[in-house]
């Protein structure tokens, strides 16, 4: 299956210093049948210090987390950091985006909106969420609502039977978790006599879009590792052998953002990981020619190898953890650039701060 996503527009309000709504167009032309996202892949957001560039990246990361992690707003430490992220004056905000979706040349345009606010108990709650779609070949068509929720209650989704089933399953939950993250947990329980129809598929497309989002930002989520190890433990307990490369890449990126540097590599993907590290070594040698190689120190860990990288120089070996901050940032940057080359939507905050001017001459 060939799956491609392209971010058309992004609207943000109430994140960090964004106290007034802002709108970003990543493609200003009318979408036509011959639209080719490959020609419009690289965009730059620039402005003065304090103009809101990092706030935009933060909003994208928040959007991704809300869509893929149904427990995101339940975490106490996450709530504490989110309260600091929401604009102090507005105490509420929203994110809205238009997404071009092409799956095996079946094209759609999705419009997703989610709003949130700090309530009297000092916690962040989702106040409204909706998803609409229209034909991707004819962008002037009107949007059709896929689902909508307000104040924690589902107001529309699918036909009457599907709606009643899903509404009961999500009762009093949708102010604490997004509908997209909630519906995936129902897949095994969904009655076979219920018609899932295109609405369900469209929500899955939205979830897939969220997985394709890749955000490189300095203020790492220090609580990510705990959630990831819980996910891995769940995989082990359920004896799921279908641990895909896509899933692994997602976990790997998030672990790299967290405090630890060791990563868990599924044994069936270890050869691919070695190839990736060989490319990483060549990339770092551009900036640090004295590096001879990067080797993987692996330890057996059930279905995984626990891997740590060793930086090999002519007269000494250095654990990755003790490499210079600049080189570690370049190593992280490599993974994000590689994912961008693989078609993922990648946001990199302060890209110029990662690369010294001497390398750009």
Task: Locate the predicted segments by residue.
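Pre-Walker A-like glycine/lysine-rich segment at the N-terminus of P-loop NTPase domains
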Residues: 2-62
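Extended helical coiled-coil dimerization/tether regions that scaffold
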Residues: 3, 13, 249-321
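Hydrophobic positions in the central parallel beta-sheet of the AAA+
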Residues: 10, 346-348
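Short acidic, glycine-rich loop/turn motifs
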Residues: 14, 97-105, 133, 311-315
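Conserved catalytic network of the ASCE P-loop NTPase/AAA+ motor domain
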Residues: 38, 88-89, 336-340
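Conserved ABC ATPase signature
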Residues: 41-50, 301-338, 348-357
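Conserved P-loop NTP-binding catalytic core
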Residues: 58-119
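Electropositive, glycine-dotted interaction segments
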Residues: 113-286
């Amino acid at each position: 299956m060939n799956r491609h996503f392209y971010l058309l527009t992004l609207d943000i309000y109430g994140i960090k210093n964004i106290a007034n709504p802002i709108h970003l167009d990543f493609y200003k032309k009318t979408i036509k049948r011959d639209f080719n996202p490959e020609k419009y892949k690289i965009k730059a957001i620039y402005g003065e210090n304090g103009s809101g560039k990092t706030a935009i990246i933060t909003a994208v990361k928040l959007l991704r987390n809300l869509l893929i992690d149904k427990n995101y707003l339940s975490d106490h430490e996450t709530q504490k950091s989110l309260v600091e992220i929401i604009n102090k004056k507005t105490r509420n905000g929203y994110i809205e985006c238009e997404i071009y979706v092409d799956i095996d040349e079946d094209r759609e345009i999705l419009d997703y909106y989610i709003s949130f606010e700090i309530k009297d108990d000092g916690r962040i709650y989702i106040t409204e969420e909706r998803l609409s779609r229209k034909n991707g070949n004819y962008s002037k068509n009107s949007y059709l609502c896929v689902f909508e929720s307000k104040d924690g209650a589902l107001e529309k989704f699918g036909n009457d039977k599907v709606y009643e089933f899903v509404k009961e399953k999500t009762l009093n939950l949708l102010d604490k978790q997004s509908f997209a993250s909630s519906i995936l947990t129902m897949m095994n329980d969904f009655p076979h006599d219920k018609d899932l129809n295109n609405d369900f598929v469209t929500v899955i497309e939205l979830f897939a879009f969220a997985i394709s989002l890749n955000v490189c930002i300095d203020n790492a989520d220090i609580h990510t590792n705990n959630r990831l190890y819980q996910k891995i433990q769940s995989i082990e307990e359920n004896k799921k052998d279908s641990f895909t490369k896509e899933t692994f890449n997602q976990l790997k990126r998030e672990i790299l953002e967290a405090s630890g540097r060791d990563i868990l590599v599924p044994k069936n993907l270890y050869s691919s990981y070695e190839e990736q590290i060989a490319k990483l070594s060549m990339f770092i040698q551009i900036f640090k020619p004295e590096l001879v190689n990067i080797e993987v120190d692996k330890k057996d860990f059930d279905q995984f190898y626990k891997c740590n990288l060793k930086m090999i120089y002519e007269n000494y070996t250095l654990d990755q953890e003790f490499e210079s901050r600049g080189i570690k940032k370049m190593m992280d940057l490599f993974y994000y650039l590689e994912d961008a080359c693989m078609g993922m939507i990648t946001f990199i905050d302060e890209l110029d701060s990662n690369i010294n001017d001497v390398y750009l001459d």
